[in-house]
């Protein structure tokens, strides 16, 4: 990867992280047991990765820096497995097993579902 790839990943990651932080600031306090901002970031990221995979698979001639910017950078910064894991662990430690299970299913199942919906949307529109 050349210097432009590093710049693309860095810019994308910064923008994705800022969006994730903004969603957390706006919505996490509404339900600390299932922080909606983190969930929104992961579901949105899942949907957008589906769109991006569909787009980049049908546009193989694009410079690789665009994929690095969008997928590795932006979506890597937006989605947050480490935050998701710490929130699930907090539920488990406090004995909130039902919330922990809902948290796990919402993020994992929801992200997979939204990724499939994103790919389906792209294929429908392409």
Curated annotation (Swiss-Prot):
This is Fluoride-specific ion channel FluC. Keywords: Cell inner membrane, Cell membrane, Ion channel, Ion transport, Membrane, Metal-binding, Sodium, Transmembrane, Transmembrane helix, Transport. Its main location: membrane. GO terms for biological process: cellular detoxification of fluoride. It catalyses: fluoride(in) = fluoride(out). It comes from Cupriavidus pinatubonensis (strain JMP 134 / LMG 1197) (Cupriavidus necator (strain JMP 134)). Na(+) is not transported, but it plays an essential structural role and its presence is essential for fluoride channel function. One of its GO terms (molecular function) is metal ion binding. GO terms for cellular component: plasma membrane. Belongs to the fluoride channel Fluc/FEX (TC 1.A.43) family. Na(+) binds at residues 76, 79. It is a multi-pass membrane protein. The gene is fluC. It holds the Pfam family CRCB. The chain crosses the membrane at residues 3-23, 36-56, 68-88, 99-119. Fluoride-specific ion channel. Important for reducing fluoride concentration in the cell, thus reducing its toxicity. It comes from the Bacteria. It is found in: Cell inner membrane.
